[in-house]
Curated annotation (Swiss-Prot):
Enzyme Commission identifier(s): 1.8.3.4
Membrane topology label: Peripheral membrane protein
GO terms for MF: methanethiol oxidase activity; selenium binding
GO biological process: protein transport
Family: Belongs to the selenium-binding protein family.
InterPro entries: Se-bd, WD40/YVTN_repeat-like_dom_sf
Signal sequence interval, chain numbering: none
Protein name, UniProt field: Methanethiol oxidase
Main location: nucleus
Entry annotated with the keyword ATP-binding: no
UniProt keyword annotations, A-Z: Cytoplasm, Membrane, Nucleus, Oxidoreductase, Protein transport, Selenium, Transport
Length: 472
């Protein structure tokens, strides 16, 4: 966090953030929905200080007041976008719920190692005031407000709008988007005010994905394949970039961290591609495919070809490396994006997945690997599922990983993870030449939680990180 007395939260620049203190604790939501355990989801606090006697242990659990919320992603009440405002303090974690559409505001300032509920925004406020539901990404704005993307409407249809919360009272103020401007689908978003732009992505209709994944629903148009470009000051959708068959289900989107940059990268889950989006000379925005993970021909799986399923992506704070997870194939990749038009693969590590040697799936044709990877065992625990959410340390040298995607899809694709619980792992990163190596001394086994096996999802540090903070 900022050290000067006249500064606001976060850091002045992304490169300043890279010099920030090493992370000591992590927050992550743990989900019981669809596990057969009728208990509330909770926010776990994990000790990640190697000098601590409680290293790689859950040191606190904050249960939510309700069941079946499906905690998912989180954001901050304020971040580096408010760096110039000394009145702003980063002390509340915003937890929108994917299924219930509640919003929990969690106080992490009073005692960072023991968070507490500060406020609950009930679903009816989101439904009535905004006509939105199924909340996903939360970002703080430079003006002090909090903006949360929606995936649907209250009836289960796709609807990509944005809820605005007051940054002090956390009351629902209404929609960010102008009336009638919501996109057909929603998911993630990132803004870049110096170019007067925001770009949002598309998952699918909640009434489709909430019941499990079906390929025929993709073919029926119930999942997205476009980037939606917004005028940042007028709150209007000014362009739709259709990514086509190569861009099915675009999920996490990241502009480069440099606030002057007019380009970024987005991962498309089902097509297993990464697109570079960029501003053209005429002011319009365009996209080009820069990475393609080939599908594998398989036997013993739901389909004859298995996609990698790119689910989470990150860009290091110096805009040098891209990281992403292939949830089904089971690997995390590191690319040098010094030239974002030509990413170069410099690191790769397998951490589970659906093509393990000795498992039910036989790979018949593989353009990447000579043989199926072996199961991964850490501290005696066989890693279930596949790598999913990732978070990079500020200095870029450590990557934290969890392996739950969404409870219903976890149950469909990795039923063993429902029984065993998910895990949290840590990868050491070579930031000079590239390279990823598993830390054998770090494991959080969420199969051994007091309330029973649980599914752990997105990761956050108290001082912000490369996916929560936006520089303006």
């Amino acid at each position: 966090m900022a050290k000067c007395g006249s500064c606001g939260p976060g850091y002045k620049t992304p490169l300043d953030a890279m010099k920030g203190p090493r992370e000591e604790i992590l927050y992550l939501p743990c989900i019981y929905r669809n596990t057969g355990i009728n208990k509330p989801d909770y926010l776990a606090t994990v000790d990640v200080n190697p000098k601590s006697p409680k290293y790689s242990q859950v040191i606190h659990r904050l249960p939510m007041p309700n069941t079946n919320d499906e905690l998912h992603h989180s954001g901050w009440n304020t971040c580096s976008s408010c760096y110039g405002d000394a009145s702003k303090v980063r002390n509340k974690l915003i937890l929108p719920c994917l299924i219930s559409s509640r919003i929990y505001v969690v106080d992490v300032g009073t005692d960072p190692r023991a968070p507490r509920i500060h406020k609950t925004v009930e679903p009816y406020e989101v439904f009535w005031k905004c006509g939105l539901a199924n909340l996903h990404t939360s970002h703080c704005l430079g003006c002090g407000e909090i903006m949360i993307s929606s995936i649907g409407d209250p009836y289960g249809n796709g609807k990509g709008g944005f809820v605005l919360l007051d940054g002090e009272t956390f009351e629902v103020k209404g929609n960010w988007e102008a009336e009638g401007e919501a996109a057909p689908f929603g998911y993630d978003f990132w803004y870049q005010p110096r170019h007067n732009v925001m770009i949002s992505t598309e998952w699918g209709a909640p009434k489709a994905f909430a019941l499990g994944f079906k390929m025929e629903e993709v073919q029926a148009g119930m999942y997205g394949h476009s980037l939606n470009v917004w005028d940042w000051t007028e709150h209007r959708r000014i362009q739709t970039i259709d990514l086509g068959e190569d861009g099915l289900i675009p999920l996490e989107i990241r502009f480069l961290h440099d606030p002057d940059a007019a380009q970024g990268l987005v991962g498309c889950a089902l097509s297993s591609t990464v697109f570079r989006f960029y501003k053209e000379k005429d002011g319009k925005w365009a996209a080009e495919k820069v990475i393609k993970v080939p599908s594998k021909k398989v036997e013993g799986w739901a389909l004859p070809e298995m996609p990698g399923l790119i689910t989470d992506i990150l860009i290091s704070l110096d805009d040098r490396f891209l990281y992403f997870s292939n949830w089904l194939h089971g690997d995390i990749r590191q690319y040098d994006i010094t030239d974002p038009r030509n990413p170069k693969l410099v690191g790769q590590i397998f951490l589970g997945g659906s093509i393990l040697r000795g498992g039910p799936v036989t790979v018949l044709e593989d353009k990447d690997l000579e043989c199926q990877p072996d199961p991964v065992i850490v501290k005696g625990k066989k890693v279930p599922g596949g790598p999913q959410m990732i978070q990079l340390s500020l200095d870029g040298k450590r990557l934290y990983v969890t392996n739950s995607l969404y409870s219903k899809w976890d149950k469909q694709f990795y039923p063993d993870m429902i029984k065993e619980g998910s895990v949290m792992l840590q990868i050491d990163v070579d930031t000079e030449k590239g390279g990823l190596k598993l830390n054998p001394n770090f494991l959080v086994d969420f199969g051994k939680e007091p309330g029973g096996p649980v599914l752990a999802h997105e990761l956050r540090y108290p001082g912000g990180d490369c996916s929560s903070d936006i520089w303006v």
